[in-house]
Amino acid sequence: AGPAGAAGPDSVIHSTWIPLSMTLQVDANNDSSYTQSITALNITQEIIDSGVVLSYIENLFVNDGSIVDVSDYGGGYLDVTYNVGVINITSYFGDLSGAYYRYVIIPGSILATNSVLKGYTKQQLKSVDYATITKALGISTTKTTN
């Protein structure tokens, strides 16, 4: 057998752990936030329409190396939006530079066939803890940046 081919369009894709390097933004009302855009070329319109993108971040509040879903982080003070080819992260409670961030892209075809994930809505998947997602999708939990 030859070498394994590249991941196809129906494969789960996950990023390496990305150390955040946020930029201070100050609006006309003198309110500040910290932002970062991450290129994610595998986020296509099809993924946005029928798949799901999940985001996880190192929990800096407890300093124990735990990983949390971004929707649970900061009580709504962290906003992550997904557009074709890019993820935009905005922190309203401080600079998260240095925290490790990872995204997981799950195509709609995987959502329909994965025995663990089948039946979950997109909203339910966004609240599934990191350990469950990595186990269901066979993703390594080792925190490396390469």
Describe the role of every protein-language-model region.
Residues 1-20:
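Collagen/collagen-like triple-helix sequence repeat recognition
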Residues 17-19, 31, 45, 62-70:
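Tryptophan-centered short beta-strand motifs
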Residues 21-49, 91-94:
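Surface-exposed ligand/attachment interfaces on beta-rich extracellular proteins
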Residues 49-51, 99:
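Residues that flank catalytic or metal-binding motifs in active/ligand-binding sites
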Residues 59, 93, 105-109:
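A mature extracytoplasmic/lumenal domain signature
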Residues 77-99:
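Structured beta-strand segments within beta-sheet-rich domains
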Residues 98-146:
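C-terminal partner/receptor-binding element of secreted or periplasmic proteins
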